[in-house]
Amino acid sequence: MSETELINNDHMALWYDPVSKFVHHKIKKTLPKGAFEEMLSTGADYLEKYGMKKWLSDDSNVVAITKEDSEYGDKIWAPRVIKAGFTYWAVVMPTSAMGNLQVTRFVKEYRERGVTVEVFDSVDAAKTWLNSK
C-alpha cells in the first residue's frame, strides 16, 4: 500500500497516495466540532502541494453532516480544491438513509461544478476507478 497516513483517530482517518496521486478520507463515526474542517483542509493542503486531482471519500459510516460542516465544504473547501485542479471524486456511499440523502445531494452539486463523480459500495472499487483516471 502506498498511502501515507496524515490523520488517524477514533473519528476519522486521512491519507494521501503519492504514487496514484489521490487523497483518501474515512469518516469512522460522527465528527466532533472542527474535525470535518481539519480533515478537509489537511487533505486540500496535500492536493495542492502534490498537484493531485483525485479524492476518495469513504463515507460509509456517515450518519449526518452538520449544517456548519456542509457550509464549510460548499463555501470554503470546494472553491479551494477545484481551483487547485480537483477533477475526480470517488465516493463510498453512506449506509444510513440520512447520510445517503446528504451525500447524494453533494454528488449532484459537485457534478454541477464540473467534477467527475462516481459512487461505489466499496473502497476497493473506488480505488480501481480512481487509478484508471
Locate the predicted segments by residue.
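Amphipathic, Lys/Arg-enriched alpha-helical "gate/interface" segment within cytosolic domains
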Residues: 2-133
